[in-house]
Amino acid sequence: MATKRDYYEVLGLAKGASDDEIKKAYRKLSKKYHPDINKEADAEEKFKEVSEAYEVLSDPQKKAAYDQYGHAGTDPNYGGGAGGFGGFGGGGFSSSGFGGFEDIFDSFFGGGGGRSVDPNAPRQGADLQYTIQLKFEEAIFGVEKEIKYNREDTCATCGGNGAKPGTHPETCHKCHGSGTINVERQTPLGRMMSRQTCDVCHGTGKEIKEPCPTCHGTGHEKKAHTVKVNVPAGVEDGQQMRLANQGEAGTNGGPYGDLYVVFRVEDSDIFDRDGAEIYYDLPVSFVQAALGDEVTVPTVHGDVKLKIPAGTQTGTNFRLRGKGAPRLRGGGNGDQHVKVKLITPKNLNEEQKDALRAFAKAGGQNVTEQQEEGFFDKMKDAFGGKKKK
């Protein structure tokens, strides 16, 4: 089993990075490696690695434990975790079915002192992943979505044992229920014993003489499954929610796997968003900026009035407190940031031009106007008749 990389290293950060640095690094890397976007072979593994790192470092308690004890402080083998919302997850993966170091050692040397895996022990089913598309406003305020997907369910005909009703699986005659057999091989070091999966029962430890007519001996059947997902207010693009026991059926009576719902949020036509903060560019005429005005500003919570002071410059920022998105972990709403964008008028009529000339003259400005070309001048230019200066 590969050694886990340092979580700070995974996110490209130094130890002790701030919450904002952790969040920004996660958003950048989760988008880069998301399987829906990145089709490289190792993208899914990197995505899961990034998500796992963020799940720990974004939680103050887990981060403190990790900073003090490393992976030992957050390893799930040290205690179970409940379902919930966070940055951790992935699709089509499960840790069930992997033995420990003792199993690997035992498979090479056929040792009798190491522990063995019971092939008939309950095993959790595989996890699944589902992507939900959200409108910008749905992510802000939350919404209930009903999703449908196919998953492996426990076979209703045989109850999951794979045998025809009225019959039962029998202990494998070759491996005697262990799921593995010892094989003697000739190696450069001489003849050695190794352990491999039983070729009769394929590691299950059981033989099914009369398979179930529905699942054909697998114990599972593919079925459509429907789940209602309560999308929390303030969810961001790329974040995930774990729905416990909504994945695929387990084996030998093991629990269902989990479903990881990935949220993809559409862009807004007028707003930008960074976490709970929302940004809006406000178009303002130079007259409004010079003389001041009261304008209407759209927010996700409805229109509000904003006073523009006289002499406002382009690029000036105003803050509308509480008009941003809800903070996912509580603490109210973020703010909306309004940036003034000065609009220069085009296609002025003569009256407007005269007014501007008078304004410039009153201010002591000497403006050299650029004259527009007439129709015949443009025709000359098109046919190379423009005089060289």
From Swiss-Prot:
Localization in the cell: Cytoplasm
First and last residues of each zinc finger (CR-type): 142-224
Listed PROSITE patterns: DNAJ_1, DNAJ_2, ZF_CR
CXXCXGXG motif repeat start-end pairs: 155-162, 172-179, 198-205, 212-219
Gene Ontology MF terms: ATP binding; heat shock protein binding; unfolded protein binding; zinc ion binding
Domain J residues, every copy: 6-70
UniProt similarity note: Belongs to the DnaJ family.
Subunit structure: Homodimer.
HAMAP family in the record: DnaJ
Protein name: Chaperone protein DnaJ
Organism of provenance: Enterococcus faecalis (strain ATCC 700802 / V583)
